């Protein structure tokens, strides 16, 4: 189930908190981490000084009001950038607070060295301690079940109310502190010290108190800093050039021009985009260990998918009853029903349901005096011995052949053909027997999840290769792979095959994603560029992965890849828009500033703004308000459609590149007209 944790972006608490943090973040010790906006803040301080002490900055008394306006607009620009980041952080803090409420101090039943039980606080537990949990107990700490089996309510962590079964010795042996034991009794070995639990790590991650920038974000910041330095040099050289041609440019105008030219839009939104990307993953109940993991998901070239539970439901369900040896379909259906009346497995229930849908009906007293024959690994058959002496069985082809041989019966000529046909279709054949006679075959089909073929088609359009991993024989694997639409499959796979496939793909320069839940998956999860572990799996798997799915839904790897691509697209789209904005603003305001002194420049003044002062103020106002206008896109992400990289590039250039060129001309002109009509400037 792909369920989102819904926390409103624009709730009163989050917005008020973001406004407060916007002022707190004005501290230069914090602002220097965002070099572009730090330059704007320094510029704000200089124009403030020019407003208070105009003579020291060569300003005339008439320019004090203008300097004050420039200072105010620059100040608001910095606040808007801080607000965008604080708003994104606010969502994470709200989610962290929700999780923190689930972390309660509980009492634990600690098993001491002599075997006695001592009641202690959960905060006193250490790694390696053994605790007992019974029905109704809150599990005091993360650990591994070493004895017993129990139903666990994990709704405090996952939000999912249905209990899950956890037991010792398997891939579903790990338990999380804060969850509740619904039934039975288990013995748990604590695997973490206080403050290092899975819930503690979740809180730190979603709160983002010490969010590390991803490599792509660092690289983009380096580019933005380089552009900022270039424009600082450009503006600094403009002053002596203007003086040479007898054009006077004030300090406030120089700073305003610099702020309009440097990439303030993406500089103000960059952190918000990264935080929001992590948040979008969290809303799908997936915890990413770093922003790097989310970004890596966006660059994935290959996805490894387990067949069972990911591509198929994993429950083989009855699809048909096929008669052999001249028997009728009705006869096979009836005895298939009889053989499964006491079979409580999903397969057995599906046989009963299908038989009844096809009109078969068992007598009300059929089970009276009947002996139930349970399925076992040795016999690989199950059924009933009826009170009238009739023996009814269903089982695997090989074991039924042995059984019929022992009973002195014969195998129908068409049985091999029907069994092979079912195997080629990717199904599992179960042969139905009455006494020493084969009646027919039950076709069990591992049903492919709805929509998987379409999703694989979308992944293929994005240039992502899909590889199905299965323990099935090659014929069955090939059939399911073709039906599902995966690009490649690995049949009869062993645990080491996964890591070998990952290394093979990585050797070809491809980034690989995979899901896993068992201890034997841990090496492959660690090797993969994106490893998504199931929360229901072992602690080893969760520690090896760089993402954990709280819903334990392996198909969610496809959503994670989509979110990663959306993050990269959003950053790229807004960067394109920002740089296109800067180019447009340059041609919009620079000619307006110097055309009065140099009439030859008027040919470049396509905007025909009312005055040089209005040109500067209009550009600054546009530069400030474009940040909050784009906050919803930064938070939500640009609309993502599966397509090739070239198609995405052309689409973004058209929408955000061309849009970034046009928007400043329209916006600045409108603001200029408003200023002129209101103030008569």
UniProtKB/Swiss-Prot annotation:
ATP binds at residues 343, 347, 375-382, 394. It catalyses: K(+)(out) + ATP + H2O = K(+)(in) + ADP + phosphate + H(+). The active site is at 306 (4-aspartylphosphate intermediate). The chain crosses the membrane at residues 37-57, 64-84, 218-238, 255-275, 573-595, 615-635, 655-675. PROSITE patterns: ATPASE_E1_E2 (PS00154). It comes from the Bacteria. It is found in: Cell membrane. InterPro entries: ATPase_P-typ_cyto_dom_N, ATPase_P-typ_P_site, ATPase_P-typ_TM_dom_sf, ATPase_P-typ_transduc_dom_A_sf, HAD-like_sf, HAD_sf, P-type_ATPase_bsu_IA, P_typ_ATPase. GO terms for molecular function: ATP binding; ATP hydrolysis activity; magnesium ion binding; P-type potassium transmembrane transporter activity. Keywords: ATP-binding, Cell membrane, Ion transport, Magnesium, Membrane, Metal-binding, Nucleotide-binding, Phosphoprotein, Potassium, Potassium transport, Translocase, Transmembrane, Transmembrane helix, Transport. The keyword Electron transport does not apply. Its main location: membrane. It is an enzyme of class 7 (translocase). One of its GO terms (cellular component) is plasma membrane. It is a multi-pass membrane protein. The system is composed of three essential subunits: KdpA, KdpB and KdpC. This is Potassium-transporting ATPase ATP-binding subunit. It comes from Caldanaerobacter subterraneus subsp. tengcongensis (strain DSM 15242 / JCM 11007 / NBRC 100824 / MB4) (Thermoanaerobacter tengcongensis). The lineage of its organism: Bacteria, Bacillati, Bacillota, Clostridia, Thermoanaerobacterales.
